[in-house]
């Protein structure tokens, strides 16, 4: 396990606390911005204006909340993982572990929170064609789902390697009426799918809305996706008060692009007593070079329209990322995560494929919940975290997705070990 904890010379986060909105031009400190072809600037401005107007429109928020409840199944429960807590209990006690059950959402992950919100925005803007990128397939499934619900044309770009790993989700998208476009360029994974989706958008910007699936990309996407996912943290905040009478000590979530983590973290950013911990994919090990630990090992650069930390070689070229988890297999990260790391407000670490598999099995056997491989990375961090916490600490983990989609991958990895 690899960690990037705040150092002694890190600025006091309270003095640099981000506001509810990014700074001018979509900046989070030095990160973010809009590094896109001129063709897309009007579309980004239109999207930012539409979102600002929508949040002020009670008809929009009422409809969004109605569908989140009746269609998505919110609010998702905050579940006390009693046996998992007991597993990490020491002789002098230990933390109590709670799961924010985003895996119980319609489509099986947090992704539908954002897909639903952006689909409603697309309808407001009169856009009838929707495109999306997907890695693990969950964002693609969520986008295909809301497009079916609203009668919108849907094209999902997915790397050919990810299509192989996530064949079940490919079939689900097609069953929902979406066109799934295989991307064979580069590593045939999420980065390449995102690049193809952006190319499509440049060509068809007048008729098409791009439902970007993470807190990455050009402004206003990092803000927009974060705000639609903030329902996770807003619910968790109230549920913690109901369940144990106060805010949690630690929030824990996996980080690829970082949408599920930001959705949980954002409503707590001002509460400096709450530790925010994101867990990346160390793949075969950070030292091997085959990983997706962007915050742990990355340097500042520009990818997919935003400045953030990226995995780069010595010449500044974006490196290939690797993770057993298709949803974390990305060489970049959302700009707000990079900023929270810089100011010391959030901590980030990385766990290997093997550590994630071990955690997936542990949670499955102890709690009867099979988490997604992405989510399993957050669970794996408990091995490092729990021994360091005082007795009575409260941990909330974002259980961001269920593991049905990953059963074949896990079976290939474990072979005859089960």
UniProtKB/Swiss-Prot annotation:
Catalysed reaction, written as an equation: (1S,2R)-1-C-(indol-3-yl)glycerol 3-phosphate + L-serine = D-glyceraldehyde 3-phosphate + L-tryptophan + H2O
Region Disordered: start-end pairs: 1-21
Top-level EC class: lyase
One Pfam short name: PALP
Pathway(s) this gene product operates in, as recorded in its UniProt entry: Amino-acid biosynthesis; L-tryptophan biosynthesis; L-tryptophan from chorismate: step 5/5
Listed CDD domains: Trp-synth_B (cd06446)
GO cellular component labels: cytoplasm
Assembly, per entry: Tetramer of two alpha and two beta chains.
Family from the record: Belongs to the TrpB family.
Protein name, UniProt field: Tryptophan synthase beta chain
Organism (species): Synechococcus sp. (strain CC9311)
Gene (UniProt): trpB
């Amino acid at each position: 396990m690899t960690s990037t904890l705040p150092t002694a010379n890190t600025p006091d986060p309270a003095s640099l606390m981000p506001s509810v909105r990014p700074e001018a031009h979509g900046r989070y400190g030095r990160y973010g911005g809009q590094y896109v072809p001129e063709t897309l600037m009007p579309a980004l401005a239109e999207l930012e204006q539409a979102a600002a107007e929508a949040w002020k429109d009670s008809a929009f928020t009422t409809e969004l909340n109605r569908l989140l409840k009746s269609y998505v199944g919110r609010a998702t429960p905050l579940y006390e993982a009693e046996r998992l807590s007991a597993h990490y209990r020491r002789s002098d006690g230990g933390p109590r572990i709670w799961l924010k059950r985003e895996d119980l959402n319609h489509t099986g992950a947090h992704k539908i929170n954002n897909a639903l919100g952006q689909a409603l925005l697309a309808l407001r803007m009169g856009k009838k064609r929707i495109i999306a990128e997907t890695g693990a397939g969950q964002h693609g499934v969520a986008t295909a789902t809301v497009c079916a619900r609203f009668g919108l044309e849907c094209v999902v770009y997915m790397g050919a390697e990810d299509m192989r790993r996530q064949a079940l989700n490919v079939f689900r998208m097609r069953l929902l009426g979406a066109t799934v476009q295989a991307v064979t360029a580069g590593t045939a994974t999420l980065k390449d799918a995102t690049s193809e989706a952006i190319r499509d958008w440049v060509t068809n910007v007048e008729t098409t809305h791009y439902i970007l699936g993470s807190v990455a990309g050009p402004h206003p996407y990092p803000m927009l996706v974060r705000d639609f996912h903030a329902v996770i943290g807003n619910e968790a905040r109230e549920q913690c008060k109901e369940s144990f009478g106060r805010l949690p000590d630690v929030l824990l979530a996996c980080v690829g692009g970082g949408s599920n983590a930001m959705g949980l973290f954002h409503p707590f950013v001002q509460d400096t007593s709450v530790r925010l911990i994101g867990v990346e994919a160390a793949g075969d090990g950070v030292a091997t070079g085959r990983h997706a630990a962007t915050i742990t090992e990355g340097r500042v650069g520009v990818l997919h329209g935003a400045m953030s930390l990226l995995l780069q070689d010595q010449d500044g070229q974006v490196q290939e990322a690797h993770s057993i988890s298709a949803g974390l297999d990305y060489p970049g990260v959302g700009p707000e995560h990079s900023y929270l790391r810089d100011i010391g407000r959030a901590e980030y670490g990385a766990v290997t494929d093997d550590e994630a598999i071990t955690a997936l099995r542990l949670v499955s056997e102890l709690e009867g919940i099979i988490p997604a491989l992405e989510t399993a990375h957050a669970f794996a961090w408990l091995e490092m975290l729990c021994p360091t916490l005082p007795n009575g600490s409260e941990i909330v983990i974002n259980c961001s997705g269920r593991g049905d989609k990953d059963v074949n991958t896990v079976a290939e990895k474990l072979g005859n070990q089960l």
